[in-house]
Design a protein with these regions (language model features):
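A conserved beta-turn-beta hairpin within the catalytic core of GNAT-like acetyltransferases
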Residues: 82-92, 102
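Conserved acetyl-CoA-binding loop-helix of GNAT-fold acetyltransferases
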Residues: 92, 97, 103-116, 127-128
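Active-site rim helix/loop that mediates acceptor-substrate recognition in acyltransferases
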Residues: 15-78
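Conserved active-site alpha-helix within GNAT-family acetyltransferase domains
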Residues: 120-124, 129-155
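C-terminal "cap" of GNAT-fold acetyltransferases
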Residues: 149-187
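Short loop segments at secondary-structure junctions
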Residues: 70-71, 100, 163-167
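A short beta-loop-alpha structural element at the N-terminal edge
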Residues: 2-14
């Protein structure tokens, strides 16, 4: 497996990664008994989110990575600029692994690469809204333990922070993602 920075020509493969990784959420949300021809599901919101993030000032190309297996992109992660009050910090997400490559350590490899790269750039911390059983294995803990809360109260239960080497305990307050996280998906 190779973890490398995202390149310009990777866009379609990255869209396919997030389409595969998050399609189950759409399928389960739209499940039910229907008659008639199958209607294709729309792209998961993560596909459009990555596209909008690329066009935003918070996009950080040095912290956007893909995982390749046999020259095939099977995973993607991006870190973008966020803020806690006046302090610049990072937000993780989305992170996705194609369903045919899951349970092979791809997600863990992407997480370790992203954390290491952010730490090497002297970033103080990374925030995310994510699964409480997955992210603690990478050192994430509830943001409230460090006095950091998301600016959307309904995110609080799954909001987590990973302090890095440059972390300063003065960083407290409300966490704000890059603007595209708050925009509805394009039709």
């Amino acid at each position: 497996m190779l973890i490398r920075r995202e390149r310009t020509g990777d866009t379609a493969a990255i869209d396919a990664v997030h389409r595969s990784a998050f399609a189950d959420h759409l399928a389960s949300a739209g499940s039910g008994h229907r008659s008639g021809p199958a209607v294709p599901l729309p792209d998961p919101p993560e596909v459009d989110l990555v596209r909008r993030l690329r066009d935003h000032s918070g996009w950080m190309p040095t912290l956007t990575m893909v995982a390749e297996l046999h020259n095939d992109i099977v995973g993607h992660v991006c870190l973008t600029r966020a803020a806690v009050g006046p302090f610049p910090v990072l937000a993780l997400g989305p992170i996705g692994v194609r369903t045919d490559a899951q349970a092979r350590g791809v997600g863990s490899a992407l997480m370790h690469a992203a954390l290491g790269a952010a730490d090497a750039l002297d970033e103080p911390l990374i925030g995310l809204v994510g699964h409480l059983d997955y992210y603690p294995r990478f050192g994430f803990a509830p943001g409230t333990r460090l006095g950091i809360v998301p600016d959307q109260s309904d995110w609080t239960s799954h909001f987590q922070i990973r302090p890095l080497t440059a972390y300063d305990s003065e960083i407290k307050g409300e966490f704000r993602y890059a603007d595209p996280f708050y925009c509805p998906a394009s039709p």
